[in-house]
Amino acid sequence: GVVEISVSTRPDCVSAEYLDIMRDIRAMTGIQMNVELGLQTANYHTLQMIDRGHGLAEFIDAVLRIKRYTGISICTHVILNLPGDTAADAKETARILTALGVDIVKLHSLYIARNTRLCDWYENGKITVCSKEEYFERVITFLEQIPETVAVERMFSRIPEKDAVFCNWGCSWWRLRDELLQKMEEEGRYQGKCCDYLNGAALCLLKSE
């Protein structure tokens, strides 16, 4: 039978009307509810550049509204190698998701589809994509900043090769995954390793001194 209903939407399309319906369905059926929100990055300059049509405030509002309902989990989609973003943006995005208490994260590696605005920018040299090594570093930095209780359901994304001008540095997603996990193991890095910045962390630092 059905064990979960997952609704994927934009942060600026979440309202009490729809959340009430999800709450009622859960009450009648006992089925777990999940809302998937596409944030992509906490950098509002990048959100504007890629024409997302919403900012960080709408995402925060959506999460806080969903949090008022029991039995509705939150999954957030993030792209860590958007043009203009840096490792600092990956870190700050992770920290915001942690502070908001999201339950699930899906990481996407940027691919550039043919016949799109990004494709034109990429082919004309207006934008570049970071190296595979830099992406690995951003993913690991992101993972270190989120609690180990957050489920990470994806770390790479892809489309058919014929439809893309750039996708995963020409590598298969499973090879990238294996390389990433090996790098984390070799460097002693893991999810949640640096998740110690909430609950008045500065006060704790002062006390330790």
Regions found by a protein language model. Give the residues of each.
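Auxiliary Fe-S-binding modules of radical SAM enzymes
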Residues: T98, I104, Y111-E209
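Hydrophobic faces of well-ordered beta-strands that scaffold small-molecule active sites
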Residues: I5-V7, M33-L37, I74-V78, V105-L107, ...
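Surface-exposed alpha-helical segments enriched in charged/polar residues
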Residues: D20-R23, L64, R68, R95-T98, ...
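Conserved SAM/AdoMet-binding glycine-rich loop
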Residues: G1-L56, D61-A62, R68-Y69
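Conserved strand-turn element in the central/C-terminal portion of the radical SAM core barrel
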Residues: D12, G38, Y44, I66-D89, ...
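Aromatic/hydrophobic pocket-lining residues that form the small-molecule binding cavity
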Residues: F59-I60, T86, A90, Y135, ...
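Catalytic cores of alpha/beta
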Residues: A16-M22, P83-A99, K162-A164
